[in-house]
Amino acid sequence: MRLTKLAALSIVLTAAPVVAAPQPPVTIAAAVASPARRPDNVKLDEGRKPAAVLKFLGLRPGMNVLDLFGANAYWAEIEAPVVGPKGHVTVWQPTQFYRDKTKQSFGEFAAKHPNVSIVTSPFEAPALPKNYADFVILNDNYHDTYWQNEKYGIPKMDPNAFLKAIYAAMKPGAVIGVIDHVALPNDDVRATVEKFHRIDPEVVKADFKRAGFVLAGSSDMLRNPADPHSTDPFDESIKGKTDRFVFKFRKPR
């Protein structure tokens, strides 16, 4: 009888879902070097310099992170071990870009990281947690707030409204890192974005200032003077090597 009970218990335990135990925080360098990262993400490191970027922006253990457009888990798989069990990473993904394949891959990733979750909403109506984030990252996507596309169901949007939602999601004193492809100065921002998927850094500075943010720093670590700025970032001649700015904005205390 005892053996029967033990066998039954073994079956129950085997069938129970395995939840990853919380792990103590690690350094940014250790998180970047982790063999647990997806190989397709690791391939992007040379062009993105994640360790240098996150160090510059100030990611630390215990932070609440808002990772915008982050369902590919490129940044989240580094952020999660760095913030550790006392921090949390919330990924926001537009519903227009959260299809079955992405849902599956992110679900598998989140199952291994108890301090990671995801929220989704339409691109044009970002539903973000209020007064939540100590740290926000927006990588290569701010220009898309000036983009519209019928194929993907993206209407013409108001960048100011998008930034207002981000501002409300951040705690006083929180930082947001903004990385994007550099465009040459042009009076028609939307036309430039439509053609090149790039944005003038001065437009970004002005937009964030108008939204109430303070520029706390900038870095040239991803600049590339050899970029002709005349192709979109998906062109094989420049893919992964575009001229990019890195801005660090802060929400005033």
Model-based region annotation:
Residues 72-84:
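Conserved SAM-binding loop of SAM-dependent methyltransferases across substrates and taxa
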Residues 101-127:
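S-adenosyl-L-methionine
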Residues 62-71:
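Conserved class I S-adenosyl-L-methionine
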Residues 211, 226-253:
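Core SAM-dependent methyltransferase catalytic element
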Residues 188-215:
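Conserved Class I S-adenosyl-L-methionine
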Residues 63, 126-140:
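A short acidic, Gly/Pro-enriched loop at the edge of an enzyme's catalytic core
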Residues 28-56, 60:
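Class I SAM-dependent methyltransferase Rossmann-like catalytic core
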Residues 80-81, 153-172:
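A short glycine-rich, Lys/Arg-flanked "PGG" loop and its adjoining helix->strand segment in the class I
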